[in-house]
Structure formats: C-alpha cells, structure tokens
Amino acid sequence: MEKVKVAVNGYGTIGKRVADAIRLQPDMELIGVGKTSPNYEAIIADKKGIKIYTVKDNIGKFEKSGIRVAGTIEDMVKEADIVVDTTPNGVGATYKPLYQSLGKNALFQGGEKADVADISFSALCNYDEAKGKKYIRVVSCNTTGMLRIICTMNKISKVEKVRATIVRRAADPKEVKRGPINSIVPDPASVPSHHAKDVLTVIKGIDIVTMAVIAPTTLMHLHTMVLTVKDKVNRDDIINTFLNTPRIILVNSSRTTVSSTAEIIEVSRDMGRVRYDIPEVVVFEDSIYTNGNEVFLMYGVHQESIVVPENIDAIRASLGLMGKEESIKVTNDTLGIMKGYLL
C-alpha cells in the first residue's frame, strides 16, 4: 500500500499527539512537523527521529539548541499530500494561503473560525459529507464531545433540543501562565456560549443553547446535558447504544468507585495509556436519567486527546482513502480506542 504523505504544522498539545497517531496508521507517513520555537517538545521530536521544519529566520535558533532542521515549513508543505494544521488559535488561517498556493489539502482545528474550511467535521456525524473536501476544520474538544453524544442519541430518537453546561478546565497540565487557580469564572457570563454555534456548523437547525464556566482544574472538561428527543426513550436503550458506539465509554461509579475526572485520569494512568490520554467521551452511567422524552446525563471530555482520532479520520475523508466505518475502525484499532465500559 502506498502511504499518503502527511505533514503536521504545529507541534504542541494536539500536534504532537496527531503526529504520533499518524505514525501508527498503515496508510499514512509522517514526513515531518512544523515548529517555530526550539523548546523541549522540539528536542523530544528530534530525539524520536521526527523531521523538524521551521521558518527560515529561526533555523539558527534550532541549530544552536542542538535540534536538527530538515528545512523550512514551506519545504515541508511542498512534500506533503495533506497538511494537518495544529498551530495556535487563529494562526492556521494565516497559513492557509501557503497551502492554497501549493495546492495542498489541509485540516484546521476548532480554534479557527468555521469559514477557514469547506466543512466542519465530526467523524460520527458527517464523515461522508466531508469526503473529498480540500479544507476541513476539525471542531474543538468540547464540540467534539457534544457531537458524539448528540449524533449517537439521534440513532435512538431524533434530537430536537439540547441544553448543556460546560465546565471547562482552566489550563492544560503543562500550561503555567493560565488560570484561574482559585475561582470559577463564567466563560462568558452571556448566554449562549460559542459552543452552541459550533455544534450548528455540523448539525444544521438543531435547537441548542450552551453555557460555560472555567473551573480550577487541568485534567478534563465536564459537561452536563439535557436532550429533548422526538419520542419517549428508555434508559436501557440509551446505555446499550452508548456501549456499542465507538469513542464513547461508560463508567459505572456505583460499581467501580470511579466518580470524578481525577479518578478517570488515574485509571488511564494505571492502564498504561500513553500520556494518560482518553480520546473517548466518558459518560457517567449513573447520571443517565430519562423523563418522558427528556434525557439527562454527565460526561467527561479529555481536552488534550479527544480530537486526535477525528484528525486521522478527517485525513482519510479529505483524500477519499476509506469509507466512514472502515476509517473509524482502523483509527480505533491503531490507537487502542475503546468502547463499552471503562472498567
């Protein structure tokens, strides 16, 4: 099988995970990563044998730090079949003219505005619609979590209304300049938060309102959600559907004593997962409650890794490499993504 050549522009929290995931795919070759600062992440990438590309003016800085440079970011893009842009929020749009001028397909992340791409993407929701699109935006971690739940619930009964509150982590574990550390901050105080609008870029016309707050934690986001569906639903049907859906796992707090994001992370550590990543949505089974045609639930979203499999599937969708079910299966198998129960 001839492998497609993939470049990752940006090598931070998401970029390094996507790069590692690409290296595990049977149909992809990581040709290199774009990095503008010679920090510890660049040093580690170099030690792992990943080719590093940077902007021309920074080549000397990398070499001074003992980091080998394979060329400029433009050189990398020229060699690639597709670029996964994981640069900081808003930066991806500034690179789009480069990708366009070289005729390269590109993926962008949820921090970019929706109009940067031809389509916003969630593998469980609209993989087929994204096939053959030159520019795809993989929605944010929180939006990915919401969409997995909503699109899965649609299999049981059409979702007509969603009301959700997002308790956001304040910072990633490595981020030392973000907070708060002793406050809960409305994000924003006005309603709705931007997450509702982002869901609408994938599922058109749904009645959705979201609110968000930032909490002093680094581990995961936590969502509380109320869905109104067309027909009366049964709790057992919801549980069984979740158990049989890839990238959603349940945790039974009563049985396992796992009842917090901290304990979910600890389980992932004890399972030996790389970086303790949890790319699955983790639904607290005990929280699932039905009242007529209303469904209530809570679930955790690991912000550092949930979008990684989405990026892998988006590569295949953009280049037309595989159908939806095949791509999701290959991605899940290579990345060790679970379904069913966490424990």
Curated annotation (Swiss-Prot):
GO terms of molecular function: 4-hydroxy-tetrahydrodipicolinate reductase; glyceraldehyde-3-phosphate dehydrogenase (NAD+) (phosphorylating) activity; glyceraldehyde-3-phosphate dehydrogenase (NADP+) (phosphorylating) activity; NAD binding; NADP binding
PROSITE patterns the record matches: GAPDH
CDD domains registered for this protein in UniProt: GAPDH_II_C, GAPDH_II_N
Enzyme Commission code: 1.2.1.59
Active site: C141 (nucleophile)
SMART domains for the chain: Gp_dh_N
Similarity comment: Belongs to the glyceraldehyde-3-phosphate dehydrogenase family.
Protein name in UniProt: Glyceraldehyde-3-phosphate dehydrogenase
Native source organism of the sequence: Sulfurisphaera tokodaii (strain DSM 16993 / JCM 10545 / NBRC 100140 / 7) (Sulfolobus tokodaii)
